[in-house]
Amino acid sequence: MTEQEEKVSFGITIPKSLKTRLKIYCAQNDKKIQDVIREALEEYLQRREK
């Protein structure tokens, strides 16, 4: 994804405990939730698209 690429909203449902872990991680690492999720999806797909 490039910085100029159009962004769209993407809603999902996740377990409450996972959301809590994500929020804690983001707070401790000064990251935005949307950035962590985007990075995780990019990494996940890169590993499986080979």
Curated annotation (Swiss-Prot):
GO BP terms in the entry: regulation of DNA-templated transcription
InterPro entries cross-referenced by the UniProt entry: 56B_RHH (IPR049123), Arc_rbn_hlx_hlx (IPR013321), Ribbon_hlx_hlx (IPR010985)
Domain of life from the UniProt record: Viruses
Name of the protein in its database record: Uncharacterized protein 13
Organism: Sulfolobus islandicus filamentous virus (isolate Iceland/Hveragerdi) (SIFV)
Lineage summary: Viruses, Adnaviria, Zilligvirae, Taleaviricota, Tokiviricetes
Name of the gene: SIFV0013
